[in-house]
Amino acid sequence: MGHDLADIKKSFEASLPGYVEKKDPKSILPQPGKRNILITAALPYVNNVPHLGNIIGCVLSADVFARYCNLRGHQTFYVGGTDEYGTATETKALQEGCTPRELCDKYHAIHKGIYEWFGIDFSHFGRTTTDHQTEICQDMFLKLHKNGYTSSQSVDQLYCNQCEKFLADRFVTGTCPMCAYDDARGDQCDGCGKLINAVDLKDAKCHMCKATPEVKQSTHIFLSLDKLQQKTTEHLDRELAKEDNRWSSNAVGITKAWMKLGLDPRCITRDLKWGTAVPLDGFEKKVFYVWFDAPIGYLSITKCVLGDNWTKWWKNPENVELFNFVGKDNVAFHAVMFPCSQLGANDNYTVVNNLCATEYLNYEDTKFSKSRGTGIFGDAAQGTEIPADIWRFYLLYMRPESQDTAFSWDDFVLKVNSELLNNLGNFINRALSFVANSFGGVVPEMNLTNDDAEVLSEIHNECMQWDKQFDGVHLKDAVKTILNVSRLGNQYMQAQTPWVLMKKDEEGKKRAGTIIGVAANIAYHVSVLLYPIMPTISATIREQCGLPALPLFTPFPICYLKAGHKIGQPSPLFQKLDPAQIAEFKAKFGGSQDAQSSAPKTAEKPKQQKKQAPTKDKKGDKKMASTAAFVELEQGAKVISQLIAQNLKKFDQAKALFTRNQLQRLDGENKQLTIDVKTLQHQLIELETAAGIKQVPKPVVSCTPTPTSTPASGIITEAPKKEAPSTPAPSEPKKAKEQKKGKGGAAAAPVDDTIDVGRLDMRVGRIIKCEKHPDADALYVEQIDVGESAPRTVVSGLVRHVPLDQMQNRLVVVLCNLKPAKMRGVESRAMVMCASSPDKVEIMEVPADSKPGTPVVCPPYTHRPDEQLNPKKKIWETVAEDLKVSAEGFAEWKGQPLLIGSESKMTAPTLRGVHVK
């Protein structure tokens, strides 16, 4: 949409699109003429507590997408639950001294409570231990059996003589036969991701007792995946050929790799008691294996709430779009295994249309581990008293869509305090408080001008992007788009200065009323965009606006709050996170509490000497007594020494932790003070401007100092000018003589040859177009706008690190004064700046409102970029040695942050302490 004022006014004054209705799940059925969206989140094992990685990987991502679908008015049914059958449950029940049913009841309630606290809004959250599960699972199997897609054969299995049972694959560990990973499970290797048979493991061990199992034979049923490969391939090819398919890139890659290797018959039964019984003679003591049984849980859980109407969702492929949300380790089961079962049953099942898989979310620089005390689990997140919506926001901001990411407390604080508190929360409170304080809480009359049309048009463009991102399941990008909208709102208010206009004549006050009315409506529109991400905050904003109903999404920020509308009571949406409290959380969840492992062991008592026969030699008795006493004292001294050493170690650990926490607290307070000072400066300028005090810009001295003119303080001083002598000084006859001439014969300014970051020409750029290099599989060729008359061609080796779709229309930082170089026949005229480790490369990020061509500077080093860096002088190589990502994620050179323009910083998404190059 352009900035035509008449069109903008028409759109702004359009009628409301309707409201989102809260429906009884029993009434949610597919409807003709509507998009009917069926959403599933991978069913978690019921024997554990979900951590943040589990939550973002499936249930939260699916919840956000379901909420978006409801905002768009689609018929949406969202299914979730707990996977309760299998060896994992049996084993956990043994460990906890209860029955499998009791264990399932306990953990189902735990999962349900955690998801409710996180605001996960399932249409129904069920479980797999139901009669409906048995009925549908057995029915699908019997149809597969009848259609000739099953077989039986004796197989080698691992049997633990010590536990007296066949071992399920997940309860055998050993060395992977394919990649030699030494902690592979018996069903799948976490090292290479390939499925394996437990009997093929090297150095296999029973997970329960650590004994070495032996191989025994048992007769099992196999699903003939080889016979079903053609059907499944045809279905997958049709889905992936659709231009609007929403398969994540990792799901596509994993699926294609599986199909390319070819499918083999796979065992679907196990020697267990806790599971869905096999309805065939001779197999009464066996149950279905979890990979066959668990996905059927989606169907049975749907039947638990809809009854016989479950088939309207699950046997209706012509009218239903199925979206599966899974972690990358679940792709094969949802893309290959389960579709094979459905297609082989030949019962018109709704088969996967869109598979949305995430990579892994790690914790800081390690993995989530309940046993090691590392990472945040769902129940612990509640205990922090940080609201659930804050967790939702950060998890979605860091959603691992194309590569593994990591939860970082430092980044968590940064994003919450900067993006939520200072950006989004500041704008909402600012706009609504102005209505409350200057207009008595009543929305003023609005008469739009071209300035208003411009911001509304920009927000309309962002909202179109938001809709496209959500529809394509690019949830992380959608979060950043919302922040862009609130940033535009802040910039609009700042540029229009309604607080100044309020002090002018009647026309000025009317103009201020228009600005504040538009800002208040933008704030309400932000609440709609925010609903899928932060539903509670969205509701709070709508209540403060005095219009709590949730409208359907419209891409244009229409006038929800008409002139004369009475708003509610504005109040701050977010509280600043306290660095001291965060330091406590870092210690608590960092696995530093090793009290059990460091506790002193109980000292063994010295063995008593056997009583000697009585003797008359009293001297001998005394000698023996003194010897025994010496032994006891010596052993006691050793125990005391051990206790002292252990306590000293614990003291040193506590001291180090205390010191680290104090430093982090002081660092956090210092950063917050810097933000507070800037905020107060900004408020002072506003007040002085409102009072009519003229603002005089701070003078800037442009000079190029010599190395000696920059003192240690970093403040650049200009040396007093001297008249040039008529003849060169004796000490430097050549320098004066050889000084280069500028244009017109004038002497050029002295050149500072000091090698530092100021000689780099780094700028913000926007990738206009990116495509694969025609002659190199590992290279991209980008056209990047760096603020010049034409875009630059840049070749980057990012194919293995960043998907092609994420390279389009992306803001980057570009080094522009390297010598152009040909890379496989294409000349590259710049370099995209990335955080780089041996295993991972991330493009450095800049604020979404950054403009192409904006220079990247590093005060106090003078920005004086060479026209082209001389390769012989190794300027780039020298500077690059100290160009790194800080512990907080900022790019810095020798400890000084690199700034976009003069304020914002360039950041790495997850990498810390690595080089930028």
Swiss-Prot record:
One of its GO terms (molecular function) is ATP binding. Residues 614-623, 732-741 have a biased composition (Basic and acidic residues). It is found in: Cytoplasm. GO terms for cellular component: aminoacyl-tRNA synthetase multienzyme complex; cytosol. Its EC number is 6.1.1.10. Keywords: Aminoacyl-tRNA synthetase, ATP-binding, Cytoplasm, Ligase, Nucleotide-binding, Protein biosynthesis, RNA-binding, tRNA-binding. GO terms for biological process: methionyl-tRNA aminoacylation. Residues 702-713 have a biased composition (Low complexity). Its main location: cytoplasm. Residues 756-857 form the tRNA-binding domain. A motif ('HIGH' region) lies at residues 44-54. Residues 591-623, 702-749 are annotated as: Disordered. InterPro entries: aa-tRNA-synth_I_CS (IPR001412), Anticodon_Met (IPR041872), Met-tRNA_ligase_1 (IPR023458), Met-tRNA_synth (IPR014758), Methionyl/Leucyl_tRNA_Synth (IPR015413), MetRS_core (IPR033911), MetRS_Zn (IPR029038), NA-bd_OB-fold (IPR012340). Pfam families: Anticodon_3, tRNA-synt_1g, tRNA_bind. ATP binds at K370. It catalyses: tRNA(Met) + L-methionine + ATP = L-methionyl-tRNA(Met) + AMP + diphosphate. A motif ('KMSKS' region) lies at residues 367-371. Belongs to the class-I aminoacyl-tRNA synthetase family. This is Methionine--tRNA ligase, cytoplasmic. It comes from Caenorhabditis elegans.
